[in-house]
C-alpha cells in the first residue's frame, strides 16, 4: 500500500497568486481534487491524504506534520505561478536544490513529462525541471515534487486554465504520473452484463403487462415466445 499526499497550495485567507480573474488557491484545489478522484477511480493499492479538500488555510508546518504522521511515499505540491512581468508563462516543476531522497529527481521527471503531454498541445512554454530552495521541497519528510502548472498572471496561460475541463485534465495527468511513479495497480473493471428473467406466463397479454410494469420501474425489457415441446 503506497501513501500519497496531494497538497493544494494556499487556501482560505491565502489566495496565492491572483490575476486574470483567477485565484491560484481555487485553481490548485480543483486540480488536486481531480487528481484524487482519478486515482481513486482508476487505481488501487494506495492511500491518499489531502491537507485541504476545501477553501481553508493550512500552514506549511501542518502539511509537514500530516506527511510525517502518515509516513508518505510521495508528496505532490499543487501550485500555479505568478510573475511581475505579465509576459512570464509556462509549466515548470521543482525539487530541492540541496540533499534529496534518491528517487526524487526520477519522480520529478515522470510527473513533468506526463503533465507536459497535456500542456504542449496548448501552446504554452516548457520551462523545464528545476531545483530551488522552496520550504516545501526542503522540509517534507518524503520525496517531494512542486508543480507550477501555469501563470495566472499571464493572459494566455490563464485562458488555458479557464478552458472547460482543463483543470480536470491536468489533475488526471498528474494522477497518471503518480500511478507510474509508484507502479499502482489499475483497477479491474467488470464489463460483463447480466440478464434477469422476470417470469414465465401462459398468456401473452399477462407477459406484456408484466413487461410494461418493469418498464415503469426503469428496466429495459423484452418478451420472448418460448415454444414448448
Which residues fall in each region the model found?
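Loop/helix-junction capping segments adjacent to catalytic residues or to phosphate/diphosphate-binding pockets
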Residues: 22, 57, 204
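Catalytic-core environment of secreted peptidases
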Residues: 1-20, 76
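Active-site-proximal helix/loop segments of hydrolytic enzymes
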Residues: 2-4, 26-191
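Glycine-centered flexibility sites
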Residues: 9-12, 16, 90, 150, ...
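Solvent-exposed beta-strand motifs enriched in subsets of small alpha/beta binding domains
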Residues: 187-229
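Glycine- and acidic-residue-enriched helix-capping/strand-helix junction motifs
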Residues: 16-30
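Short, solvent-exposed loop/turn elements at domain surfaces
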Residues: 14-16, 103, 206
Amino acid at each position: 500500500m503506497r501513501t500519497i499526499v496531494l497538497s493544494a497550495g494556499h487556501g482560505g485567507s491565502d489566495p496565492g497568486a491572483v490575476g486574470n480573474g483567477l485565484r491560484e488557491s481555487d485553481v490548485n484545489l480543483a486540480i488536486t481534487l481531480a487528481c484524487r478522484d482519478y486515482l481513486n477511480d482508476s487505481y488501487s493499492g494506495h492511500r491518499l491524504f489531502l491537507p485541504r479538500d476545501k477553501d481553508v488555510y493550512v500552514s506549511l508546518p501542518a502539511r509537514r506534520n500530516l506527511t510525517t504522521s502518515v509516513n508518505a511515499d510521495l508528496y505532490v505540491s499543487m501550485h500555479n505561478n505568478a510573475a511581475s512581468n505579465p509576459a512570464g508563462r509556462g509549466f515548470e516543476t521543482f525539487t530541492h536544490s540541496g540533499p534529496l531522497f534518491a528517487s526524487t529527481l526520477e519522480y520529478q521527471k515522470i510527473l513533468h513529462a506526463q503533465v507536459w503531454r497535456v500542456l504542449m498541445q496548448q501552446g504554452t512554454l516548457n520551462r523545464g525541471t528545476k531545483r530551488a530552495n522552496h520550504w516545501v521541497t526542503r522540509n517534507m519528510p518524503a520525496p517531494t515534487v512542486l508543480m507550477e502548472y501555469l501563470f495566472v498572471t499571464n493572459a494566455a496561460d490563464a485562458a488555458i486554465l479557464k478552458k472547460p475541463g482543463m483543470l480536470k485534465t491536468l489533475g488526471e495527468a498528474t494522477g497518471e504520473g503518480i500511478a507510474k511513479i509508484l507502479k499502482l495497480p489499475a483497477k479491474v473493471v467488470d464489463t460483463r452484463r447480466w440478464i434477469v428473467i422476470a417470469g414465465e406466463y401462459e398468456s401473452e397479454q399477462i407477459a406484456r403487462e408484466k413487461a410494461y410494469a418493469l418498464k415503469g420501474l426503469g428496466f429495459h425489457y423484452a418478451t420472448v415466445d418460448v415454444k414448448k415441446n
